[in-house]
Amino acid sequence: MATESTTNTTTIIARADQHDIDLHKASDRVNFGSIKEPIDVPYLLGVQTDSFDWLIGSDRWKARVEEDEKNGTNTVAHTSGLDEVFNEISPIENFAQTMSLTFSDPYFEEPRHTVQECKEKDYTYSAPLYVNAEFENGDTGEIKSQTVFMGDFPLQTPHGTFIIGGTERVIVSQLVRSPGVYFDRQQDRTSDKEVFGAKIIPSRGAWLEFEIDKKDQPQVRVDRKRKQSAIVFLMAIGMTKSEIAQAFKDYPLVLDALEKETLETQDEALVDLYRKIRPADTPTPEAGKNLLDSFYFNTKRYDLARVGRYKINRKLGVEADFNDRSLHQEDIIATIKYLVALHDGAATFPGKRNGEDVDLRVDVDDIDHFGNRRIRQVGELIQNQLRTGLSRMERVVRERMTTQDAEAITPQSLINIRPVNATIKEFFGTSQLSQFMDQNNPLSGVTNKRRLSALGPGGLSRDRASMEVRDVHPSHFGRMCPIESPEGPNIGLIGSLATFGRVNPFGFIETPYRKVVNGHVTDEVEYMTADRDLDHVIAQANQELDENGNFVSKSALARVGEEEAVDVPVSSVDYMDVSPRQMVSLGASLIPFLEHDEGHRALMGTNMQRQAVPLIESERPLVGTGSEWRAANDSGDVIKSEKDGVVTYVSADLIRVMNDDGTTSSYKLAKFQRSNQTTCYNQRPIIHDGERVEAGSVLADGPAIQKGDLALGKNLLIAFMPWNGYNYEDAVIISQRLVQDDTLSSIHIEEYEIDARETKLGAEEITRDLPNVGEDAVANLDERGIIRIGAEVEAGDILVGKVTPKGETELTPEERLLRAIFGEKSREVRDTSLRVPHGETGTVIGVKEITREDAEEDGDELPNGVNQMIRVYIAQHRKITVGDKLSGRHGNKGCISRILPEEDMPFLADGTPVDIMLNPLGVPSRMNLGQVLELHLGWIAHSGWDISLDPNMEAEWKKLVPSGAEKAEPNTPVATPVFDGVKPEVLKGLLSTTLPNRDGDRLVGPDGKATLFDGRTGEPYTKPISVGYMYMLKLHHLVDDKIHARSTGPYSMITQQPLGGKAQFGGQRFGEMEVWALEAYGAAYTLHEMMTTKSDDVDGRVRVYGAIVKGDNLPPAGIPESFKVLLKEMQSLSLNVEVLNAEGVAIDMKDEDDDPASSADDLGFNIGARPDAAAKEDQKAEEPEYQ
């Protein structure tokens, strides 16, 4: 057998070597871009994974630190986040400082469960964190050391997400103002004089603000309290008058203020300062000194952070060590000097950088500049939570040091890990920055992980954010995308990291530039932060170069500082952009011809790509931008080979590769799993048995991915033409073919859960034996009462049978006898089965059952009081239908208004019917011409082309066609990179050289238009029509999820009006404006009926229902419940409101026979109840009462 297997292996390898195989490692698109990028796009999820690696000090982070030290660079923080936070808190000392507790060397054990197990069983993917704790008793000199368990710490999956309680979540990076020193200029309210101010903002601690007021006096504000003299503050921190005079000898403004100051000693200054900060307390020099120390000079209370120290050093030209995170006298002196220089209008300020004397530019700071805004990544956000938890734990430790016997104390007895665990759990579960991962498609997942949010704790609030903060800023270039942002109230507050952007150890976003030396562009790439951009002249990436990398023209369009772009001589250019797509995010870089779309529409196109639903059969775009490969590969939804080797086994759910190093790797594929957005997550192998693969080769496609390329929609034949008004106002007409062939069909998987609990009246039971339910209703349930897999179910069908004990009344003797004979079985129960909700349908594809016995065996955890939990998964096959939303990639969205038979659609001369008709009026006013250019290039890619078919051999456009793109077969995918795409003249030329069809005809002319024929009459249309292939997406706004109808259902308890919304099975609101409409028509009876019988006349609606059932005339309406509520509200305002009868006597509005309950009893039915009402009892929306 061994020999045979060896022979087989040899054969396989030989077969793999025989033919030159596509190793699935790069996109096979024909690229029309002319600019070569000197570097690859950085790993798209690096913004998440690198930060978490730093936090936990992983091996990947250690390797990067080693490389950093070897290269002598500073691209990585050299102390891990956990080490930092444990070093900060150590040592914890008691109040007498006779005992101390020190932490060191945190490490993780292996995670208890795999990522897949956590998803299936609702666990949190985490690993136990241990730390070495050392307790020292100063009195005896005794040291006790222990390894202490610090709780389970959530771990990141390889793709930058966290599994919390079984659901996949993402921690979004936060944009915040950086700690440091900031200078500003404001107009004084009373005079027109400019007032200059400075703020020293720490990462943690009190602010310190300086100001030169309208009288030219230097003032200080301590901890946002009252203003006082800056001279007094300098004296309070220990400077004498002579030292102040010496330090500010070149600053007359400060010397004038010093002369006027009457206080002479530090003690007087401290007393004066304390009196103004704490006016209620008795001022003493000691109290003043303690207050100042605790505000600014206590490292436990005040922390500039490394980034704050870096910013202060750069701004003021001081040279303190980055790890020196406290404030010093020199910083305060330099701040006041800079402020005075700013006030005096000086252009430069003397300082030091890298040990050299330099002249720093004096200017006020722009708070919206990306040199002053930094990113708090996932690692730092978790570290801050850990710091909060440990500081709470510190208080507990101090208390225990004083209360416990010193001899018996061990580190374990002092430490209580509950506050630490609670803080981290709260952050992952409820923080604004911990988001339910968007798994709609691979792009939405990547974008979610690259999102930058200015909201959240310590950030802005959307109500107070000004236009300036939201606006696009020049410093965003290459760092944050100017296009991708939400359309609602969060516009400008939530952005996306630019394609080439990366975050440096201080949290500032860097973007790469090519170095230019004497007009020669090198391949040397340098990453720069936004504040360094200002010091250089930077040319655009599309500046023309010759083959040696020299500028072709004598001048170049370049950015100089914050000014508009200007033409400069090429000799003065310092740097050049690395790529035209450097400015935009991944989502925007996927829009072909982005440069021809108006900004708002590009924003919509970018956002709508994230809403595209993965289709049953994915198809990559014919017209792409070249970014599709990277987007799909870095998303984590494709399976890639870990090592070089040969594929030995392929099935739908498993791929096995024999690696060249003799090992074997197995790759499990996800099959028909439910995503967070209920879409179908399914992976398909794209390699064959015997194929050779390299490390990084794509083995299997994920959802919305084809051949390793992102494939969000379908290439469809589009005609821009109106059709009987059915595509008016962005409506879309589609062909029946798209429905029949499942071209735009998708699978959606819903999860339904039910649990059997212990109640006060006994245990609930999962059973097939349900009261008052016929056999046909339980036909698809197995003997346990659970639906069988494969069953087709509709709304109201039972998925899991469950009975709940009813409340018992006093038993009669006969009942007691039956109870004694038959035991518990004769107890009264009610049916609380899990049913398919209203409007849902589908096929059962999976059932998961967890019982308490199973849970105890497997170590699973069921919530308290739950005996059994069952989950049912139902898959829906949704075809495209009228009301669904379709969209292109250019913000051209529309709702399907008609599905025409294929034979009625307009057709080309060879009989090919078009798939979709779009309204041409949707283009000019919206200025998204990218869709028209995509249409033409789509036709070219579909037909194939050969530029030699143009008889003019010297045509200018041919020179612009890149090598390798001279000809192509039909259905060749092409790439037109953003800002470097196909030129209009090339597009025109290619349209005239498309390959003819088998009849030798070119159906579309050089102008991109074709003669179309009316499908109904066969007559040609009078004018040629733009026809071509466009990539269309089916968005997640599906009519099946939105359509809703109500007959009778739940009512609000207070107003007795029907609830609103599909989730509550609510009614249509007949609002104020609708009432006006009926008033305008004088439809008095309809209006009266709407506001009484059809709404909240409780008794009337029951009687009307009865009258309709019995065929009687409708009874007169009663008094609406909301009118009674209004009376009660007026009475609660102490207004005496009474109802008088004809004789003028006050009467009660509720009559004896005005009882809805008795009316319902008389009729023998209850109109407010629904079959699945019992199942929804737990959902108390607005306290519904079933009337």
Curated annotation (Swiss-Prot):
Q: Note whether Nucleotidyltransferase occurs among the keywords.
A: yes
Q: Which reaction does it catalyse?
A: RNA(n) + a ribonucleoside 5'-triphosphate = RNA(n+1) + diphosphate
CDD domains named in the record: RNA_pol_B_RPB2 (cd00653)
Q: Write down the superkingdom of origin.
A: Bacteria
Which keywords, in A-to-Z order, does the entry hold?
DNA-directed RNA polymerase, Nucleotidyltransferase, Transcription, Transferase
Q: Which SUPFAM superfamilies match?
A: beta and beta-prime subunits of DNA dependent RNA-polymerase (SSF64484)
Q: Where is this region: Disordered?
A: 1150-1187
The record's annotation in Gene3D superfamilies points to: 2.40.50.100, 2.40.50.150, 3.90.1100.10, DNA-directed RNA polymerase, beta subunit, external 1 domain (2.30.150.10), DNA-directed RNA polymerase, subunit 2, domain 6 (2.40.270.10), RNA polymerase alpha subunit dimerisation domain (3.90.1800.10), RNA polymerase Rpb2, domain 2 (3.90.1110.10)
Q: Where is the composition biased (Basic and acidic residues)?
A: 1173-1187
**What family does the entry list?**
Belongs to the RNA polymerase beta chain family.
Q: What is this protein called?
A: DNA-directed RNA polymerase subunit beta
- Organism of this sequence: Bifidobacterium longum subsp. infantis (strain ATCC 15697 / DSM 20088 / JCM 1222 / NCTC 11817 / S12)
